[in-house]
């Protein structure tokens, strides 16, 4: 049972009391020091063993301390599961991580390749682990062909220009159309003038 020692602190609230004597302060300091050494069991002697190289309290065992772990890479965060198979088949180890699963599907490992199960379950290209390997190979090939076809078809996006370049583009097109109109009008006038002159020449 622990005994609590009351500290002899000088009271500063009462101004009419006289300050404590020096021997009372010394006795209070000795009591506090003894209590601190009893609580923490602070040793009075320190040694530096050769195998450790740092100072430790005298009497501590250095042989029973567990060895420090060797520095190395972090352990992998993957889950490894080995399935039991008959004697004619080799055991298969499946390693699944969260980073390999894409969005929208569940990654299932088969003998040939990995396929994705959709939520609806109406996709004919998905396979399970109990299906025939030939069926899974054909379905995986169809899945790959669909994926490659989807990757090859790219939609061409319309080119959008900034406002200032758009203004320049409209100006250039409008100036082109206006210049073409001017050329057409001039050619019409020249044709009309030449036909009028020709009619004047041919008239009696």
Curated annotation (Swiss-Prot):
Keyword tags: Host nucleus
Compositionally biased tracts (Pro residues): 66-76
UniProt key word Ion transport: no
Localization annotation: Host nucleus, Host nucleolus
Region annotation Disordered: where it falls in the sequence: 59-90, 118-150, 172-204
Record-level GO cellular component terms: host cell nucleolus
Biased composition (Low complexity): 123-140
Additional free-text comment from the UniProt record: The protein AAP uses an unusual ACG start codon.
Protein name per its UniProtKB record: Assembly activating protein AAP
Source species of the chain: Adeno-associated virus 2 (isolate Srivastava/1982) (AAV-2)
């Amino acid at each position: 049972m622990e005994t609590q020692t009351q500290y002899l602190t000088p009271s500063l609230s009462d101004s009419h009391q006289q300050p404590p004597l020096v021997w009372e302060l010394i006795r209070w300091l000795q009591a506090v020091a003894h209590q601190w050494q009893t609580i923490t069991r602070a040793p009075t002697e320190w040694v530096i063993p050769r195998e450790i190289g740092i100072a430790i309290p005298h009497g501590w065992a250095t042989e029973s301390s567990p060895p420090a772990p060797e520095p190395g890479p972090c352990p992998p965060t993957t889950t490894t599961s080995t399935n039991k198979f008959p004697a004619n088949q080799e055991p298969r180890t499946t390693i699944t991580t969260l980073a390999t699963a894409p969005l929208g599907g569940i990654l299932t490992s088969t003998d040939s390749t990995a396929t994705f199960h959709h939520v609806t379950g109406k996709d004919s290209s998905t396979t399970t682990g109990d299906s025939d390997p030939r069926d899974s190979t054909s379905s995986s090939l169809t899945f790959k062909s669909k994926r490659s076809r989807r990757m090859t078809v790219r939609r061409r996006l319309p080119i959008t220009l900034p406002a200032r370049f758009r203004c320049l583009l409209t100006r250039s097109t409008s100036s082109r159309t206006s210049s073409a109109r001017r050329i057409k009008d001039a050619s019409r006038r020249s044709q009309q003038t030449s036909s009028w002159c020709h009619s004047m020449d041919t008239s009696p």
